[in-house]
């Protein structure tokens, strides 16, 4: 009796595991599509977000949504086939197509984040050049096209082969049978791009830290021969006193070193405090997205290195499954991170969707005049 009940128990456990896996994949798919589509609509509808950084973020969110829509249903289908024993994982053509799409979206995110890091550095370190040349939509369009072109060149032809029978990774990262180091080149290029992105942000951190050092003010004394103070250290008080009628003697000379601030193109100053805070918030948000990309793709890249360089069985199956699921989670986590790190996005979201506001916020936004109705 005990032996007869064991197969049924194992079958029930496998069915429960399959149901949990399909439910989790469905949840990831829905969260990714809902978050990325909502984020894209917010950027398109809000005019204050029509700037180059948010255009790049829009492209990143659309790519994540397409990746979730293309890859997660294939993983769900492979899981159902493996559980029902209805056939092997996808054939050679299907496996190469899935491998190409996975490599394309992965490299697109890596190259786009590298371009974003470079533009963030220019926005802080060379703000005048960035404001004149790179702040519009043409720069964002060029970066997006370059990211897609480089990703297409890196992912085509597919270098991944169907080497595993696991339903989580039906197209596992394997070395080619003829010994061509295709998968190894794929991994090395990805590591170089991600490492270069973090080096750019590290250089930006050093730049901000060097400019935060307090330097003592060097006071230049004003020149005075007849009580009319002028020169580099003059504050204009003597001229103001003379104009008000408190002075005697000749008219003081014009102050040196004061340039009139006009509305022209050359009148734009360096990075002021509010602009600096806005650029810093954008840098924090994009670096959080870049760091999460490294943390969620890092375990899978390490496992792939071990499978390519050592042997396919060198990686424990539990670690490989967990690393693959982390890459699935990366497709839907970017909108959450952006809303957490960017106050401007939260304000625009409340303005575009008033139904999501709390009652206290709504009452503060639309006050009611009780005296006007006699209360």
From Swiss-Prot:
The chain crosses the membrane at residues 24-44, 56-76, 98-118, 140-160, 182-202, 286-306, 321-341. Glycans are attached at residue 3. SUPFAM superfamilies: Family A G protein-coupled receptor-like. It holds the Pfam family 7tm_1. Belongs to the G-protein coupled receptor 1 family. Residues 45-55, 119-139, 203-285, 342-375 are cytoplasmic. It comes from Homo sapiens (Human). InterPro entries: GPCR_Orphan/Phoenixin, GPCR_Rhodpsn, GPCR_Rhodpsn_7TM. This is Probable G-protein coupled receptor 27. Orphan receptor. Possible candidate for amine-like G-protein coupled receptor. GO terms for molecular function: G protein-coupled receptor activity. PANTHER family: G PROTEIN-COUPLED RECEPTOR (PTHR19268), G-PROTEIN COUPLED RECEPTOR 27-RELATED (PTHR19268:SF8). The keyword ATP-binding does not apply. Residues 1-23, 77-97, 161-181, 307-320 are extracellular. It is a multi-pass membrane protein. The keyword Membrane applies. Its main location: membrane. One of its GO terms (cellular component) is plasma membrane. Disulfide bonds join 95-171. It is found in: Cell membrane.
């Amino acid at each position: 009796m005990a032996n007869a009940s064991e197969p049924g128990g194992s079958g029930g456990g496998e069915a429960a595991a399959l149901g949990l896996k399909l439910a989790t994949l469905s949840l990831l798919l829905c969260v990714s599509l809902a978050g990325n589509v909502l984020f894209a609509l917010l950027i398109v509808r809000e005019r204050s977000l029509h700037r180059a950084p948010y255009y790049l973020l829009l492209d990143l969110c659309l790519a994540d949504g397409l990746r979730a829509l293309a890859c997660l249903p294939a993983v769900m289908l492979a899981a159902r086939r493996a559980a029902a024993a209805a056939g092997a994982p996808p054939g050679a053509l299907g496996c190469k197509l899935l491998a190409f799409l996975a490599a394309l979206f992965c490299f697109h995110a890596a190259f786009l984040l590298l371009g974003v890091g470079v533009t963030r550095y220019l926005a802080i370190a060379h703000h005048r050049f960035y404001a004149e040349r790179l702040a519009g939509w043409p720069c964002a369009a060029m970066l997006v096209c370059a990211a897609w072109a480089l990703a297409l060149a890196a992912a085509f032809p597919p270098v991944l082969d169907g080497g595993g029978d696991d339903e989580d990774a039906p197209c596992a990262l394997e070395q080619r049978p003829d010994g061509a180091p295709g998968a190894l080149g794929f991994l090395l290029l990805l590591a170089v791009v991600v490492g270069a992105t973090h080096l750019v942000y590290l250089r930006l951190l050093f730049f901000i830290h060097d400019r935060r050092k307090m330097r003592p003010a060097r006071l230049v004394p004003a020149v005075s021969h007849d009580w009319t103070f002028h020169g580099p250290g003059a504050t204009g008080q003597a001229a103001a006193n003379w104009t008000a009628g408190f002075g005697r003697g000749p008219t003081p000379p014009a102050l040196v070193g004061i340039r009139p601030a006009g509305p022209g193109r050359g009148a734009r100053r360096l990075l002021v405090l509010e602009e600096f805070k806005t650029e810093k918030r954008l840098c924090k948000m994009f670096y959080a997205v870049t760091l999460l990309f490294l943390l969620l793709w890092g375990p899978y890249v390490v496992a792939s290195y071990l499978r390519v360089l050592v042997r396919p069985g060198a990686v424990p199956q539990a670690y490989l499954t967990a690393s693959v699921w982390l890459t699935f989670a990366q497709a839907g986590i970017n909108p959450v991170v952006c809303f957490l790190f960017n106050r401007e996005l939260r304000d625009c979201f409340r303005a575009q969707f008033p139904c999501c506001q709390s009652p206290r916020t709504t009452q503060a936004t639309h006050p009611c005049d009780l005296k006007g109705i006699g209360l």
